Amino acid sequence: MKNKEIQEQRIKGYFLQATKDLLKSEGLQSVNVRNIADRAGYSYATLYNYFKDINDLVFLCVYDFYGECEQHVREHTKRQERGIKRLRASIRAYVDFFVQYPGIFSLFFMENLGSFKDKGRATEIISFSLDKVCEEEWNYCVSKGILQVEQVELIKSQIRHATLGLLMLYINQRVSFPYTELINRLYLQTNAILESCSPGGGRDGGGVSVHNSLISIKVK
């Protein structure tokens, strides 16, 4: 790689990191050309030498943030037993990532993406991010007969909507319960969905599960 190309990539990286830092700390409302340029240490005119507009930068941030979320989930679940246990752990790690970075959650799920040049691609990355970070375990559970292949898409959809709903309420402070209660409710919801759809109740052993949105009781 030539020196000019190396310098170009480095300057692009400064602008990208500056945008990511603003999104994480202050949200999309803080992202404008001058703020990005100030944080990157360059003039705002320089930004347009490397990017068409701010939307280009924000889309790259979406892609990078998804990669960070995926890495976070992988790092926090690699020691878990494969199957349902790692699937549950992956869902929790996904939630923990957004609790740690509420600005990213706001960008992903609360901002209008209508002006994005690559709106369709960005929407797909965002909307199915939970499914994707758990994809290996979904496939593993199907391959081992833990979950039935014809039900997996329904289970994914139910868990995705329940998880994002909880996060939306928690991050927007529409509920008063603490983080520990968030995780407790996450487990209850996840268990209820898995137990209602999987041949073995999503657990080892037999028995019949009785559950609703607040309780999950296994009757031997």
Predicted regions and their residues:
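Hydrophobic alpha-helical connector segments
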Residues: 74-103, 155-159, 203, 220
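Basic, helix-initiating cap at the start of DNA-binding domains
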Residues: 1-26, 30-35, 39
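Short hydrophobic/aromatic patch on the recognition helix
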Residues: 40-51
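Amphipathic alpha-helical packing segments from all-alpha helical-bundle domains
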Residues: 74, 118-144, 153-157, 164, ...
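Short amphipathic alpha-helical segment with a characteristic S/N-K-E followed by hydrophobic residues
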Residues: 15, 30, 53-58, 69
